[in-house]
């Protein structure tokens, strides 16, 4: 029995382990696996997108040949089509702007803060994605995405976050 429990724990922890053979320069090997978003440009990859509360929320990655050339930006578009938020602005290396975690149960999330407001883009392995907006310990908003996602658990996303040195939340 102990062996089975240990094996299950080992397999679960491997679910979000970064592929060792990838480099930031070739991190998109399966571009069709990523969602698409009108908020991300033609030279960018949509790492994550969500439609909720008549808005579109996307995490766009701009790849470079080297890790220091890559950047990630969170964007929000309102119902009129206007981009109302870009973070970080200007776009820069993600290690100073975001944190990333892929847990043993397969859930993954990207966290960041703008001032005293915290944002969590959450991709549960077995449920629909959502955005949690907090201030201190109080949740200000919980936006459930209209579509499923699970793109934060893709091997390419995991490899990119690790290659770029995006830290785990503290």
Report the location of each language-model feature.
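Short, structured surface segments that line ligand/substrate-binding pockets
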Residues: 99-132
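Short, surface-exposed beta-strand/loop "edge" segments at domain boundaries and coil↔beta transitions
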Residues: 56-58, 78-87, 117-122, 128, ...
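Bacterial N-terminal signal peptides that target proteins for export
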Residues: 1-8
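Sec/Tat signal peptide C-region and signal peptidase I cleavage site
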Residues: 19-23
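Short polybasic amphipathic segments
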Residues: 69-78, 110, 128-135
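C-terminal partner/receptor-binding element of secreted or periplasmic proteins
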Residues: 136-170
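Bacterial N-terminal signal peptides
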Residues: 8-16
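N-terminal secretory signal peptides
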Residues: 24-93
